UniProtKB/Swiss-Prot annotation:
Key word Plastid present: yes
Organism (species): Calycanthus floridus var. glaucus (Eastern sweetshrub)
GO cellular component: chloroplast thylakoid membrane
Protein name: Photosystem I assembly protein Ycf3
Alphabetized UniProt keyword annotations: Chloroplast, Membrane, Photosynthesis, Plastid, Repeat, Thylakoid, TPR repeat
Keyword Metal-binding included in the entry's annotation: no
Record gene name: ycf3
Its biological purpose: Essential for the assembly of the photosystem I (PSI) complex. May act as a chaperone-like factor to guide the assembly of the PSI subunits.
SUPFAM superfamilies, per the entry: TPR-like (SSF48452)
Subcellular location, record wording: Plastid, Chloroplast thylakoid membrane
Length: 168
């Protein structure tokens, strides 16, 4: 049984019903419908913390989804799961793949910056200032891109850029 049919709360049930109605009335191919179903089930599993199930659904959705814009959100969500699991290298890979398909994902740039900043902080603790500087430079670039896409958002990143004298 698809996950969308087993969700217990009212909002999830309502969202599933609306999504099913939209899938019936909007002209889409069966592959697009199937990809969306896997994506929706992945989001549901992810929101419940069932990351393994979410990844299975997202991987299947990426196999079926042909639209680059839609694929970008699937890849972004895979990146979120890898970030949550502490798999930062994999997360960066998926965020980058998402941005390749949709360069207007400020949240992906922000998450990439957070990971780079974290790695820079780790390098500082390990006494490697050269590596720390490289990671911090990369974090700054990603935060600048996120801020450029959504001015007024990412206030903490904006403040860090000013304090670190990395904002032009």
């Amino acid at each position: 049984m698809p996950r969308s049919r087993i969700n217990g709360n009212f909002i999830d049930k309502t969202s599933s019903i609306v999504a099913n109605i939209l899938l019936r009335i909007i002209p889409t191919t069966s592959g697009e419908k199937e990809a969306f179903t896997y994506y929706r089930d992945g989001m549901s599993a992810q929101s419940e913390g069932n990351y393994a199930e979410a990844l299975q659904n997202y991987y299947e959705a990426t196999r079926l989804e042909i639209d680059p814009y839609d694929r970008s959100y699937i890849l972004y969500n895979i990146g979120l799961i890898h970030t949550s699991n502490g798999e930062h290298t994999k997360a960066l890979e998926y965020y980058f793949r998402a941005i390749e398909r949709n360069p207007f994902l400020p949240q992906a740039f922000n998450n990439m910056a957070v990971i780079c900043h974290y790695r820079g902080e780790q390098a500082i603790r390990q006494g490697d200032s050269e590596i720390a500087e490289a990671w911090s430079d990369q974090a700054a670039e990603y935060w600048k891109q996120a801020i450029a896409l959504t001015p007024g958002n990412y206030i903490e990143a904006h403040n860090w850029l000013k304090i670190a004298r990395r904002f032009e």
